Amino acid sequence: MDAKLSPNQGLNISGIGLASSLAAGLGIAALTLDWMANRNPWQGTSLTLPLLLCTIASAIAGYFVVPLLQALKTGQIIREDGPQAHLKKAGTPTMGGIFFIPVAVVGACVLSNFATEVLAVSALTLSYGLIGWIDDWQILRRKSNKGISPRMKLALQIGFAAAFCLWLMFNQPANITSIALPWVSFALPLGFLFWPLAGFVLVAESNATNLTDGIDGLAGGTVAIALLALGAIVAPTSPALMVFCAALSGSCLGFLAHNRNPARVFMGDTGSLALGGALAAVALLTNSLVALFILSGIFFVETLSVMAQVSYYKATKGPDGKGKRLLKMAPLHHHLELSGWSELQVVSSFYVIAAILAAICLAIASGGA
């Protein structure tokens, strides 16, 4: 990890080239998955059409919204103790989630004929996006990296998670509290314990994607991969949520037209909290928690790197009040940057890992079908 790498060693690709490759790869994957499932890729209830339409719509929306965000002076506050290469990003507008999240929600609702489960997941997604927007707005208003207090943010996340769980409790079959295990015809019955687990998953997933959003194109691309795979997995039991996942995946791709390196806009907490909430909500509603765990491997490692860094620092704190660090900086992607990796090396590597995790998930799903 500490090996010094030149900025483009072993990677002769630009930000737009990487984003285009991802979009092409996911487009081909969507077509292939539709073909394998005997779905018409050009009908609303598919992976391909929602992905394509929302990619285009999100990219077009960005060409109008990004200049508006610039005019409103919503420039991101950059941490001075972070990678020095990030200082040049100062002034890049944030809150990009305000355009690509609504595009996906509207697209999914229309293409699914306003299915009840899509409306519920959309409400949770927008609610978490609202929490992120409040946090982003406070950061901009105070001109610092401090938005709303962590306690307030957590309280809002738990509150919206509880509301979603209440909807699940009264509108879904009783067996939703049993977790399906792949490859075996057995479900782990959790009973009442399912509900605190569900709340934890919603809060943890949203915070994990939030921590991953630290490099141009990183969160948007990895979440797009996870969403498309999750959409394919839930398709047999919930075609409407397949459409939602494909639409949000496409909207992430459209956002990358503006967020790829060098980024013209950041998604901010407005986008990252919403994306994590969406992933968790779909998984809970479709009994796909095992799939979510695998697909979120990158987000969990990023979160664990922060937890390990903080815990080790506190455990090794001496009389002078200073402790030792496991990593040069947390989350992991910043450690890699400070170890000599370029942003494109980190992002492309994480894309490959996300694709491998998606392939593993799809293989497990097909094996258990």
Swiss-Prot record:
EC assignment: 2.7.8.13
Gene Ontology molecular function terms on file: metal ion binding; phospho-N-acetylmuramoyl-pentapeptide-transferase activity; UDP-N-acetylmuramoyl-L-alanyl-D-glutamyl-meso-2,6-diaminopimelyl-D-alanyl-D-alanine:undecaprenyl-phosphate transferase activity
Keyword annotations of the record: Cell cycle, Cell division, Cell inner membrane, Cell membrane, Cell shape, Cell wall biogenesis/degradation, Magnesium, Membrane, Metal-binding, Peptidoglycan synthesis, Transferase, Transmembrane, Transmembrane helix
GO biological process: cell division; cell wall organization; peptidoglycan biosynthetic process; regulation of cell shape
Keyword Ribonucleoprotein appears in the UniProt entry: no
UniProt main location, coarse: membrane
Keyword Cell cycle: yes
Annotated compartments: Cell inner membrane
UniProt topology in membrane: Multi-pass membrane protein
Pathway named in the protein's UniProt entry: Cell wall biogenesis; peptidoglycan biosynthesis
InterPro entries in UniProt: Glycosyl_transferase_4, PNAcMuramoyl-5peptid_Trfase, PNAcMuramoyl-5peptid_Trfase_CS
Cofactor(s) demanded: Mg(2+)
Catalytic activity: UDP-N-acetyl-alpha-D-muramoyl-L-alanyl-gamma-D-glutamyl-meso-2,6-diaminopimeloyl-D-alanyl-D-alanine + di-trans,octa-cis-undecaprenyl phosphate = di-trans,octa-cis-undecaprenyl diphospho-N-acetyl-alpha-D-muramoyl-L-alanyl-D-glutamyl-meso-2,6-diaminopimeloyl-D-alanyl-D-alanine + UMP
Assigned GO CC terms: plasma membrane
UniProt similarity note: Belongs to the glycosyltransferase 4 family. MraY subfamily.
Record-linked PANTHER family: PHOSPHO-N-ACETYLMURAMOYL-PENTAPEPTIDE-TRANSFERASE, PHOSPHO-N-ACETYLMURAMOYL-PENTAPEPTIDE-TRANSFERASE HOMOLOG
General function of this protein: Catalyzes the initial step of the lipid cycle reactions in the biosynthesis of the cell wall peptidoglycan: transfers peptidoglycan precursor phospho-MurNAc-pentapeptide from UDP-MurNAc-pentapeptide onto the lipid carrier undecaprenyl phosphate, yielding undecaprenyl-pyrophosphoryl-MurNAc-pentapeptide, known as lipid I.
Protein's name according to its UniProt entry: Phospho-N-acetylmuramoyl-pentapeptide-transferase
Gene designation: mraY
